Amino acid sequence: MSHNDTIVAQATPPGRGGVGILRVSGQQARNVAQAVLGKLPKARYADYLPFKDADGTALDQGIALWFPGPNSFTGEDVLELQGHGGPVILDLLLKRILTLPGVRIARPGEFSERAFLNDKLDLAQAEAIADLIDASSEQAARSALNSLQGAFSARVNHLVEALTHLRIFVEAAIDFPDEEIDFLSDGKIEAQLNEVIGDLDAVRAEARQGSLLREGMKVVIAGRPNAGKSSLLNALAGREAAIVTDIAGTTRDVLREHIHIDGMPLHIIDTAGLREASDEVERIGIERAWQEIEQADRVLFMVDGTTTDATDPAQIWPDFIARLPAKLPITVVRNKADVTGEQPGISEVNGHSLIRLSARTNEGVDVLRNHLKQSMGFDTSMEGGFLARRRHLQALEDAANHLQQGKAQLLGAWAGELLAEELRLAQQALSEITGEFTSDDLLGRIFSSFCIGK
């Protein structure tokens, strides 16, 4: 589809509501205004007008806003029609606009894509629009807004500028070897490189926090039947999300709850008790439990404290531990402290965290919440942060690796060309974040995940 087309879409959610908004962007937006409104509204003023059909009859009446390009969200001529939010009314108005020449329905994210292509937003800011809409906590929303306002991009652009400055010195030393310009003898290049590496590490740490706010952590509760897994899910969720009975195998399928701990999203997953299945339904539930375990960020190994005194997971259930992915973090949760008389709390056993609690009485559950927050390295004291996506983290990691390779060249045999190339690759990786260096395929994947009308 051409970016020269004029596009239209509903900007408000589908369904019944008090207000419904249609957004038009492109060269034909002026003609749409003339056809539907009978005139072109004054730029950037709210005008209360009837919205007319082709025969001149009114379809609706509401507020029209006219934003001539390039001073608009997309950088093109933009018309917004704010009418009543009934789906029939909006559908009639949308059909009316689509009868006009050169107008088509917008693809998901196409308004934001045009804003990016017309330099109204960089790619990180455009992604922040979707993240702001999808934010699941106040802290995530604030961080997404910071990204939309350019906080993340400013940090990245500062790094890119520093690398540009560094590359000038390095490439000058390569291009003019006879000019007696020795940038290495006084250690200035090494000092500048170390400064860039330090700044990049700080951005990476903040980006990891932003990624936690956006992606959250997937925690799977696993163990034998009747260990209290569903009771723990209910305790963490603060509601009766799962059925709890004394009957082994009550939970047959995967149950999911999304909670927040100090703004950090947690995806808590309760699974079927692991044992030899008694029927086909239970077998499928246990198979799904293992699928969730293999994709988890952390496993809470639930143990009924009344059945064993062991605290080492390898002693409690060797076969279970042997089947777990090698690098998967495990937290042993000894449940039913209210029955065993154990003191709720946390300790370390053979490299694993051990938490004693009672899911039934909630004793020790706060200890588990704090443990989950700390295990992900989430720092609530970081103010004014930004949200980051997986691709951002990968780009930052790639840049860091190239800088370390460049430093090795600098401190080793002084292979100037190789150092310059590593600096160029680091700069290219950072530029992918803001979209200065980005493939069309990546752009398509990013914007296709947006809402229609955004």
UniProtKB/Swiss-Prot annotation:
E.C. designation(s): 3.6.-.-
Places the protein is found: Cytoplasm
Binding-site residues for Mg(2+), renumbered to this chain: S230, T251
InterPro entries: G_TrmE, GTP-bd, GTP-bd_TrmE_N, GTPase_MnmE, MnmE_dom2, MnmE_helical, P-loop_NTPase, Small_GTP-bd
Positions bound to K(+): N226, T245, I247, T250
An individual GO BP term: tRNA methylation
Alphabetized UniProt keyword annotations: Cytoplasm, GTP-binding, Hydrolase, Magnesium, Metal-binding, Nucleotide-binding, Potassium, tRNA processing
Listed PROSITE patterns: G_TRME
Residue ranges constituting the TrmE-type G domain according to the UniProt record: 216-377
GO molecular function, one term: GTPase activity
Positions contributing to (6S)-5-formyl-5,6,7,8-tetrahydrofolate binding: R23, E80, K120, K454
Pfam families xref list: MMR_HSR1 (PF01926), MnmE_helical (PF12631), TrmE_N (PF10396)
Cofactor(s) this protein requires: K(+)
CC cofactor note: Binds 1 potassium ion per subunit.
Binding locations of GTP: 226-231, 245-251, 270-273, 335-338, 358-360
GO cellular component: cytosol
Keyword Cell cycle in annotation: no
Sequence similarity: Belongs to the TRAFAC class TrmE-Era-EngA-EngB-Septin-like GTPase superfamily. TrmE GTPase family.
Subunit structure and binding partners: Homodimer. Heterotetramer of two MnmE and two MnmG subunits.
Function: Exhibits a very high intrinsic GTPase hydrolysis rate. Involved in the addition of a carboxymethylaminomethyl (cmnm) group at the wobble position (U34) of certain tRNAs, forming tRNA-cmnm(5)s(2)U34.
PANTHER family, alphabetized: TRNA MODIFICATION GTPASE GTPBP3, TRNA MODIFICATION GTPASE GTPBP3, MITOCHONDRIAL
UniProt protein name: tRNA modification GTPase MnmE
Organism of origin: Cronobacter sakazakii (strain ATCC BAA-894)
Gene designation: mnmE
